[in-house]
Design a protein with these regions (language model features):
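An acidic/histidine-cluster motif and surrounding catalytic segment
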Residues: 1-110, 121-153
Length: 153
């Protein structure tokens, strides 16, 4: 299953469209189809700077400061009818800073956060420990299929 991915950039130093497409579609290779077979899944990815992420994080999560990735899934009934999954917001400066601080390849960190955000659009979460373990295991498997090392190691 190949997703329709709309990519919008308002940030510097972001991956190519082809990279986002590879990472998102790897998620669909490892998860049950989110839509009926005749409907392709569709999502948007927006790459932003610190100010926009700080504003969105405050408005929607009541948290101060920027975070690395936020996902905004649509209602599952709408997804089933239209294929729309939702939106992913990724903060480019946070991704770069975290990769540097954690000693990770920046493209690997972009891949991880894109996979993470896409899984949230599919209903995965990490609020409870068992959910977190399931989601992390799936992220590791997806990234491994892309020859990207375990981000939690």
């Amino acid at each position: 299953m190949t997703a329709a991915i709309h990519i919008d950039r308002d940030a510097e130093a972001t991956p190519a469209d082809e990279a986002f497409e590879l990472w998102v579609n790897a998620v669909f290779d490892h998860t049950p189809a989110p839509t009926p077979s005749e409907i392709s899944p569709e999502l948007s990815i927006r790459c932003v700077e610190l100010d926009e992420m700080t504003d969105v994080n405050s408005r929607f999560r009541q948290k101060a400061g920027a975070t690395n990735v936020l996902s905004f899934p649509v209602d599952p009934d709408l997804t089933e009818k239209t294929g729309l999954l939702g939106d992913i917001l990724i903060c480019a400066p946070v991704v770069t800073d975290e990769a540097e601080q954690q000693g990770k390849d920046v493209s690997h960190h972009w891949a991880h956060l894109t996979v993470h955000g896409t899984l949230h659009l599919l209903g995965f979460d990490h609020i409870e420990d068992d959910q977190a373990q399931q989601m992390e295991a799936l992220e590791i498997a997806i990234l491994n299929s892309l020859t990207i090392p375990n981000p939690y190691a």
